Amino acid sequence: MTATEIQKVLPHRYPMLMVDRVLELVSGERILAQKNVTINEEFFQGHFPGNPVMPGVLIVEALAQAGAIALLKMDRFAGKTPYFGGVDKVKFRRMVRPGDTLTLNVTLDKLKDNIGSAHALATVDGEKACSADLLFLIK
């Protein structure tokens, strides 16, 4: 999926759209996506001047958005709005900086009615940057 196709699925827009491309997608099961981190990201103006680091919470948000795409591509959730229901077991292992390509790998674990859980992993050049268990709510 291209950025234009992603915007047809996710309600997020700049500066909060954190997924640039989808490489692999099995609707309702898993997704492999990317976020190209550039120096032009607004958050780098204050985090941190002279030493830019992507805020960890935005890495988790990117993972959640990727997971939301996997859910919203299911026929029963098309056109709905995804909400972040919770996060658990978050671990940050590597700083993400301008020029990095953040690879987002999300596997949906459970789905009951409009609530889903997933395991998520963000990597840069194959190195773990962040892992988390996510909870989604679709309305």
Curated annotation (Swiss-Prot):
Keyword Lipid metabolism assigned: yes
Q: What is its EC number?
A: 4.2.1.59
User: One GO term of the cellular component aspect?
Assistant: membrane
Class of this enzyme = lyase
Subcellular location per UniProt equals: Cytoplasm
Active site as annotated: 47
An annotated Gene Ontology molecular function: (3R)-hydroxyacyl-[acyl-carrier-protein] dehydratase activity
**What does the UniProt keyword field contain?**
Cytoplasm, Lipid A biosynthesis, Lipid biosynthesis, Lipid metabolism, Lyase
Tell me which family the UniProt entry assigns to this protein: Belongs to the thioester dehydratase family. FabZ subfamily.
**So what does this one do?**
Involved in unsaturated fatty acids biosynthesis. Catalyzes the dehydration of short chain beta-hydroxyacyl-ACPs and long chain saturated and unsaturated beta-hydroxyacyl-ACPs.
Q: What is this protein called?
A: 3-hydroxyacyl-[acyl-carrier-protein] dehydratase FabZ
